Amino acid sequence: MKILLPILICFFSINIHAQNFGGGLILGLSTSQVSGDHLGGFNKAGLLVGGFIDLQLSKTLKGQMEMTFIQKGSNNPNMNENSYSDISLSYVGIPLLLKYQQSSTIAIEGGIETAFLISASDNDVYGKISANSTREFNTVDISIFIGMNYSINSKLILNSRISNSIIPIRDHASGATFKLNKGQYNSVLSFALHYII
């Protein structure tokens, strides 16, 4: 977590009212799954909250940096019927992205996110499973994403985004690897409102 302090200082020290800079707040919902956990579907709902700053690079192109708290993982809606545990993960994420303004109301985006794990647990029907009985999660999750923005008005933007880890969040239970499949990966579909300050 020590690495977050200088990033936080830089993030919030930028004057968002300077020429070509903007910024705002983020509030939304994440839905996620973890590949390789025997559970399918974006069944895990979580909180997505944070802030952003952006820089107008050209008439149609913006660079943007965000800092968010996001919940990821997987959910087993049939836990009483099978023995598969699900996963709860919380991260502080730093997405870096480019936004292309396709029209007055639509923008498309793509980028990379580095997320730092702040809490993790495997869960069964009785609650959290002891950390001594589970495999350890990696402390950093790196993912790539694409998304779309719809401008509701001059202050409010609806953002939808899909992302996938490019490095495993932890090894498979067996420790095996399969070519590009090196372990378990986060997949996230998120929906958020961006309020421009």
Indicate where each model-derived feature is located.
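Bacterial Sec-dependent N-terminal signal peptides
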Residues: M1-I26, L193, I197
